[in-house]
Amino acid sequence: MSKELIKRILSSIILIPLTLYFIFAGSFYFIFFTIICFLVASYEWHKMTKKLNYKLLGFTFLLFSFFTFYESLTDFYVGIFVLLICVATDIGGYLFGKIFKGPKLTKISPNKTYSGMVGGYFLSLISLSYFMSWINHEISINWFIATILLSTISQIGDIIISYFKRLSKIKNTGKIIPGHGGLLDRIDGMIFAFPTFYIIELMGVLSR
């Protein structure tokens, strides 16, 4: 098992239980946790970007993203679903990319491959199957489409953050997680996935 895979798994093992702990600790603690994460992510974005319009756009988006993060995770099952799909997409993409390699997906993020993209979809759909079994719910076409959409958005989020890191000529967005980089490095897909799912929820197309 490579160091990078261990890094991704350990990040998930730490971040998901930590998030769930603050959810169950009560609304005050969860709000506090959300604000701290927002401030850390905003600081990393500020350090990474140079142009004022990028900074303002990023701050505005992060504010909306963490609002949807909080709103989604007040519903335990919704929060778990989005987190699960993002983690599965990240790990599936890494595993398939390393095993099957193949053509690069984009020059912006040279480690991304088409095989990795397929792997992200594959593991996210496997995760959907287990999730729906857990909540005793059949997989509908809407849930299938939502999973594919979230996986796609998560991968796009990864590429977008990689683009700005490339512009700034940095490898990681920060050093807050020892050996793992910054918070944005770990949640790059999630900050795009949560707003997406929030909009899907507002549309009322997913039955539970």
Regions found by a protein language model. Name each.
Residues 199-208:
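Juxtamembrane boundary at the C-terminal end of a transmembrane helix
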Residues 35-43:
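Central hydrophobic cores of alpha-helical transmembrane segments in multi-pass inner-membrane proteins
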Residues 20, 102, 170, 197-200:
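Hydrophobic alpha-helical membrane context
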Residues 18-30, 44-49:
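Short, hydrophobic transmembrane alpha-helix segments
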